[in-house]
Amino acid sequence: MLGLCGQRLPAAWVLLLLPFLPLLLLAAPAPHRASYKPVIVVHGLFDSSYSFRHLLEYINETHPGTVVTVLDLFDGRESLRPLWEQVQGFREAVVPIMAKAPQGVHLICYSQGGLVCRALLSVMDDHNVDSFISLSSPQMGQYGDTDYLKWLFPTSMRSNLYRICYSPWGQEFSICNYWHDPHHDDLYLNASSFLALINGERDHPNATVWRKNFLRVGHLVLIGGPDDGVITPWQSSFFGFYDANETVLEMEEQLVYLRDSFGLKTLLARGAIVRCPMAGISHTAWHSNRTLYETCIEPWLS
């Protein structure tokens, strides 16, 4: 009898515990789900948030649950506003997003938006950006005859556009804020109210602080390619640019790198710079190309 009773004890305990089963299930740890950092997207020249519907779809599909904010500021022609004005507007928009994400955020910034984002990382001493993904952005400036320029300045060519862009009036247009004429470097350094400052090419009181702020970033992901058709030279997306003979010098040959004026050399030394060149993609297709997303963007959205 004792043996039989001993065999029945486990069943008896199960019966006693049955009323408490719902409570036990509630107390059990939930299955682990990946929690992704919020993503902030900044558009480019003449763009709007609608242009990024495919990118939004890709992120939602591969990283479900990710909070993605495509900032709807300075759309269309408003994107011609001076870049410092845009930086201030975008700063006001990203501060509350970052405040709600103590684990950090990711930035995906397209074309002109990549320069806006780099300036944001420079002026914000409390940003928490993990990956700054610069998507086909003229990080070292622009020197090319594009349809945008022909529409805005129909009587000018790239060889004489410096006469407009390096004037106080010209600096009121965003395009001129990063116009970089390699044949008039002295004028660029003196007149550029934006690019020469965030590059640390011209002395200013905030240079040291801006460099320190920029170095808070976790990863700098640079994306571009030879078939872009707009960014000129296309290597500007990787901090390369023309010398006075219009020979492209790569990032490591640029003075801003050699002097580490805003932190590029430091970032590369710590393995924080990722370069992802891709051929066969035109400028307006970067944010909708699925292969590009899977290869160059998705791996950095932790």
Swiss-Prot record:
Main location class: other
Which Gene3D superfamilies does the record associate with it?
Answer: alpha/beta hydrolase
The similarity annotation says: Belongs to the palmitoyl-protein thioesterase family.
Q: What residues make up the catalytic site? A: S111 (nucleophile), D228, H283
Membrane-crossing residue ranges in chain numbering: none
This protein's name = Lysosomal thioesterase PPT2
Q: What is its EC number?
A: 3.1.2.2
* Cellular component, GO annotation: extracellular exosome; extracellular region; intracellular membrane-bounded organelle; lysosomal lumen; lysosome
Q: How does activity depend on pH?
A: Optimum pH is 7.0.
Residues with attached carbohydrate = N60, N190, N206, N245, N289
GO BP annotations of the record are: fatty-acyl-CoA biosynthetic process
Q: Which UniProt keywords apply?
A: Disulfide bond, Glycoprotein, Hydrolase, Lysosome, Signal
Give the reaction(s) catalysed.
hexadecanoyl-CoA + H2O = hexadecanoate + CoA + H(+); S-hexadecanoyl-N-acetylcysteamine + H2O = N-acetylcysteamine + hexadecanoate + H(+)
Q: What role is this protein assigned?
A: Catalyzes the cleavage of thioester bonds from S-palmitoyl-CoA or S-palmitoyl-N-acetylcysteamine (unbranched structures) but does not have activity against palmitoylcysteine or palmitoylated proteins, branched structures or bulky head groups. Conversely, hydrolyzes both long and short chain fatty acyl-CoA substrate.
Q: Which organism is it from?
A: Homo sapiens
Lineage, highest ranks first: Eukaryota, Metazoa, Chordata, Craniata, Vertebrata
Tissue spec: Broadly expressed, with highest levels in skeletal muscle.
**Is Hydrolase among the key words of this record?**
yes
Between which residues do disulfide bridges form? C109-C117, C165-C176, C276-C296
Q: Where in the cell is it found?
A: Lysosome
Give the range the annotation lists for the signal sequence.
1-27
**Keyword match Hydrolase:** yes
Molecular function terms, GO-annotated = fatty acyl-CoA hydrolase activity; palmitoyl hydrolase activity; palmitoyl-(protein) hydrolase activity; thiolester hydrolase activity
What SUPFAM superfamilies does the record point to? alpha/beta-Hydrolases (SSF53474)
Pfam families reported for this sequence? Palm_thioest
